[in-house]
């Protein structure tokens, strides 16, 4: 009986969460697209100009010369 009650409550929560998130689906898709574009951005190769570590493919920017290592 306890197992049936747990399954019933889980099903109720899943149904409620699904109907609540339907209105937010457009925003969720846009957010994941933005996240993917950050992951697939271009990086500067070794010897190229940089201002911060995250611009370089190797994630290291030498501040003294402003070049990627």
UniProtKB/Swiss-Prot annotation:
InterPro entries with a match to the protein in the record: Conotoxin
Domain of life: Eukaryota
Pfam families tied to this protein: Conotoxin (PF02950)
Disulfide cross-links: 43-57, 50-61, 56-68
Tissue specificity annotation: Expressed by the venom duct.
Coiled-coil annotated residue ranges, if any: none
GO CC annotation: extracellular region
Major subcellular site: secreted
Misc remark: This precursor corresponds to allele E1h. Has not been merged with other alleles since they may differ due to geographic variation (see strains in PubMed:19606224).
Protein name in the entry: Conotoxin Eb6.19
Species the sequence originates in: Conus ebraeus
């Amino acid at each position: 009986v306890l197992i049936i009650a747990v399954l019933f409550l889980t099903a109720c929560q899943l149904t409620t969460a699904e109907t609540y998130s339907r209105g937010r689906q457009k925003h969720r898709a846009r957010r994941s697209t933005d996240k993917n574009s950050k992951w697939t951005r271009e990086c500067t190769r070794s010897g190229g100009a940089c201002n911060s570590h995250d611009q370089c493919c190797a994630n290291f920017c030498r501040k003294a010369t402003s070049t990627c290592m």
